[in-house]
């Protein structure tokens, strides 16, 4: 996880928020099995004493994460992806035990000799944490340049994982150069 934890510190002149990257340990395993044009895969991870953001810093909780996914490629032109996920946070000091679960999906297609990819992808929390839907278009101009555009819609209550972004629906345009 590359996201910092924000910690409130008294530096003598008042409170100051600083970003910290606390260390953590993770154990996990994954599998994948292909069946012709489809793949079934799964992952499970255990993160003991994982850092969890709190009101004035971070605290620690054991975190279990699991994913079970299915990919289907139709003639190398159309792509379907569906995943079920779940996270269980056990007994943190501030928030207690929590459980999140849901599904992610992508439906896309390629055209113009695979240079253009269009589709829709998203995330739905069945535990009531909101939804994210993205409609996108990606175009590979050549081996170095790639352009993409899309729109993202967020839903959910203000106090939910995705709902806190509800007022942040946005349109994007990206141009990338790889060398």
Stretches with model-predicted labels:
Residues 166-179:
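Outer-membrane beta-barrel "beta-signal"
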Residues 21-92:
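Long, well-ordered mid-to-C-terminal structural blocks that present hydrophobic/aromatic surfaces
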Residues 32-36, 71-73, 108-112, 138-140, ...:
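Structural signature of outer-membrane beta-barrel channels/translocons
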Residues 37-41, 77-81, 113-118, 144-149:
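Repeated loop/turn-to-beta-strand initiation elements of outer-membrane beta-barrel proteins
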Residues 26-28, 65-69, 104-106, 134, ...:
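Membrane-embedded beta-strand positions in outer-membrane beta-barrel channels/transporters
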Residues 2-7, 40, 51-55, 89-94, ...:
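Outer-membrane beta-barrel proteins
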Residues 1, 35-37, 46-50, 84-90, ...:
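Transmembrane beta-strands of outer-membrane beta-barrel pores
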């Amino acid at each position: 996880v590359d996201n910092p934890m924000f910690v409130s510190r008294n530096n003598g002149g008042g409170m100051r928020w600083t970003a910290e990257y606390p260390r953590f340990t993770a154990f996990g395993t994954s599998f994948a099995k292909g069946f012709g044009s489809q793949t079934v895969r799964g992952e499970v991870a255990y993160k003991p004493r994982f850092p969890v953001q709190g009101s004035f810093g971070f605290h620690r909780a054991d975190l279990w994460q699991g994913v079970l996914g299915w990919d289907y490629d139709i003639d190398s032109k159309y792509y379907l992806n569906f995943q079920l996920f779940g996270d269980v946070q056990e007994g943190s000091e501030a928030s207690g035990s929590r459980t999140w679960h849901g599904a992610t999906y992508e439906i896309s297609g390629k055209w113009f000799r695979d240079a253009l990819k269009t589709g829709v992808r998203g995330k739905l929390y069945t535990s009531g944490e909101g939804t994210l839907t993205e409609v996108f278009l990606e175009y590979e101009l050549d081996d170095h340049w790639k352009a993409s555009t899309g729109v993202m819609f967020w839903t959910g209550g203000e106090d939910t994982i995705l709902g806190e972004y509800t007022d942040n629906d946005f349109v994007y345009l990206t141009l990338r150069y790889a060398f």
